Amino acid sequence: MRKPLIMIALTGLAMLGACKPTPPAAVKPQSALDVMERVMVSASSCWFKSGDPAFKSYRMDAELTSYSGQPRILLVRKGSGDIRPLLVVMAQGTPARLQAFGPVMNEPLSGRISADVKRWANGSSACH
Protein backbone atom coordinates (compact mmCIF):
# COMPACT_ATOMS: atom_id res chain seq x y z
CA MET A 1 0.00 0.00 0.00
CA ARG A 2 2.84 2.39 0.80
CA LYS A 3 4.74 1.73 -2.44
CA PRO A 4 1.89 2.89 -4.70
CA LEU A 5 1.47 6.06 -2.59
CA ILE A 6 5.20 6.77 -2.72
CA MET A 7 5.20 6.25 -6.50
CA ILE A 8 2.25 8.62 -6.92
CA ALA A 9 3.94 11.22 -4.72
CA LEU A 10 7.23 10.95 -6.66
CA THR A 11 5.40 11.19 -9.97
CA GLY A 12 3.59 14.30 -8.72
CA LEU A 13 6.87 15.88 -7.60
CA ALA A 14 8.47 15.12 -10.95
CA MET A 15 5.55 16.74 -12.74
CA LEU A 16 5.76 19.83 -10.53
CA GLY A 17 9.46 20.10 -11.23
CA ALA A 18 8.73 20.08 -14.95
CA CYS A 19 6.29 22.99 -14.50
CA LYS A 20 8.73 25.38 -12.87
CA PRO A 21 9.18 28.56 -14.85
CA THR A 22 12.28 28.86 -16.95
CA PRO A 23 14.55 31.73 -16.00
CA PRO A 24 14.27 34.73 -18.32
CA ALA A 25 16.80 34.88 -21.10
CA ALA A 26 19.62 37.27 -20.46
CA VAL A 27 18.99 40.58 -22.18
CA LYS A 28 21.87 41.57 -24.39
CA PRO A 29 22.98 45.13 -23.63
CA GLN A 30 22.12 47.51 -26.45
CA SER A 31 24.97 49.17 -28.30
CA ALA A 32 25.16 52.93 -28.71
CA LEU A 33 24.29 52.57 -32.39
CA ASP A 34 21.22 50.41 -31.68
CA VAL A 35 19.91 52.91 -29.15
CA MET A 36 20.59 55.97 -31.30
CA GLU A 37 18.92 54.39 -34.33
CA ARG A 38 15.80 53.85 -32.24
CA VAL A 39 15.95 57.40 -30.82
CA MET A 40 16.49 58.89 -34.28
CA VAL A 41 13.52 57.07 -35.84
CA SER A 42 11.21 58.11 -32.99
CA ALA A 43 12.47 61.71 -32.94
CA SER A 44 11.93 61.98 -36.68
CA SER A 45 8.42 60.59 -36.40
CA CYS A 46 7.31 62.34 -33.21
CA TRP A 47 9.07 65.69 -33.41
CA PHE A 48 9.23 66.41 -37.14
CA LYS A 49 6.94 64.30 -39.32
CA SER A 50 4.06 64.87 -36.90
CA GLY A 51 4.38 68.65 -37.33
CA ASP A 52 4.97 69.19 -33.61
CA PRO A 53 5.02 73.01 -33.14
CA ALA A 54 7.73 72.78 -30.46
CA PHE A 55 10.20 71.55 -33.09
CA LYS A 56 8.93 73.53 -36.09
CA SER A 57 11.94 75.87 -36.15
CA TYR A 58 14.49 73.02 -36.10
CA ARG A 59 15.72 70.31 -38.40
CA MET A 60 17.45 67.11 -37.43
CA ASP A 61 20.73 65.78 -38.74
CA ALA A 62 21.72 62.22 -37.87
CA GLU A 63 25.35 61.18 -37.58
CA LEU A 64 24.93 57.52 -36.75
CA THR A 65 28.04 56.18 -38.43
CA SER A 66 30.96 57.50 -36.48
CA TYR A 67 34.54 56.34 -36.19
CA SER A 68 34.53 57.56 -32.60
CA GLY A 69 31.81 55.07 -31.67
CA GLN A 70 29.55 57.90 -30.52
CA PRO A 71 26.54 58.07 -32.84
CA ARG A 72 24.53 61.24 -32.43
CA ILE A 73 21.63 63.29 -33.66
CA LEU A 74 21.79 67.06 -33.94
CA LEU A 75 19.09 69.71 -33.94
CA VAL A 76 19.98 72.84 -35.88
CA ARG A 77 17.95 75.94 -36.68
CA LYS A 78 15.91 75.35 -39.84
CA GLY A 79 16.72 77.70 -42.74
CA SER A 80 19.71 79.25 -41.00
CA GLY A 81 23.24 79.41 -42.34
CA ASP A 82 24.46 78.77 -38.80
CA ILE A 83 25.08 75.03 -38.66
CA ARG A 84 26.10 74.91 -34.99
CA PRO A 85 23.89 72.37 -33.24
CA LEU A 86 21.41 73.64 -30.68
CA LEU A 87 20.95 70.11 -29.33
CA VAL A 88 23.22 67.08 -29.41
CA VAL A 89 21.91 63.68 -28.34
CA MET A 90 24.62 61.06 -28.35
CA ALA A 91 25.33 57.62 -27.00
CA GLN A 92 28.48 55.65 -26.36
CA GLY A 93 29.43 52.20 -25.18
CA THR A 94 27.66 48.92 -24.55
CA PRO A 95 25.40 49.21 -22.68
CA ALA A 96 24.73 52.59 -24.23
CA ARG A 97 25.12 55.69 -22.09
CA LEU A 98 23.12 58.66 -23.37
CA GLN A 99 23.86 62.36 -23.16
CA ALA A 100 21.82 65.34 -24.32
CA PHE A 101 23.35 68.80 -24.28
CA GLY A 102 23.33 72.15 -26.03
CA PRO A 103 21.51 75.48 -25.73
CA VAL A 104 18.06 73.89 -26.13
CA MET A 105 18.66 71.96 -22.89
CA ASN A 106 18.59 75.33 -21.06
CA GLU A 107 15.07 76.07 -22.35
CA PRO A 108 11.65 74.86 -21.14
CA LEU A 109 11.67 72.20 -23.88
CA SER A 110 14.53 70.35 -22.14
CA GLY A 111 12.27 68.35 -19.82
CA ARG A 112 10.28 67.02 -22.73
CA ILE A 113 13.42 66.21 -24.73
CA SER A 114 14.90 64.30 -21.79
CA ALA A 115 11.70 62.34 -21.19
CA ASP A 116 11.25 61.52 -24.89
CA VAL A 117 14.85 60.40 -25.37
CA LYS A 118 14.80 58.20 -22.25
CA ARG A 119 11.51 56.60 -23.28
CA TRP A 120 12.74 55.89 -26.83
CA ALA A 121 16.10 54.60 -25.59
CA ASN A 122 14.22 52.13 -23.37
CA GLY A 123 12.35 50.72 -26.37
CA SER A 124 9.09 52.64 -26.55
CA SER A 125 8.16 54.45 -29.75
CA ALA A 126 5.32 56.44 -28.15
CA CYS A 127 5.43 60.14 -28.88
CA HIS A 128 4.37 61.36 -25.39
Predicted regions and their residues:
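Post-signal-peptide N-terminal segment of Sec-exported extracytoplasmic proteins
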Residues: 33-74
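Mid-chain, structured segments of secreted extracytoplasmic proteins
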Residues: 69-104
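C-terminal partner/receptor-binding element of secreted or periplasmic proteins
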Residues: 41, 97, 103-128
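Extracytoplasmic/periplasmic, Sec-exported soluble proteins
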Residues: 27-38, 105-109
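Short, intrinsically disordered, charge-biased short linear motifs at domain edges
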Residues: 4-6, 29-34, 112-115
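Bacterial Sec signal peptide processing site at the extreme N-terminus
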Residues: 13-34
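Sec-dependent bacterial lipoprotein signal peptides
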Residues: 1-19
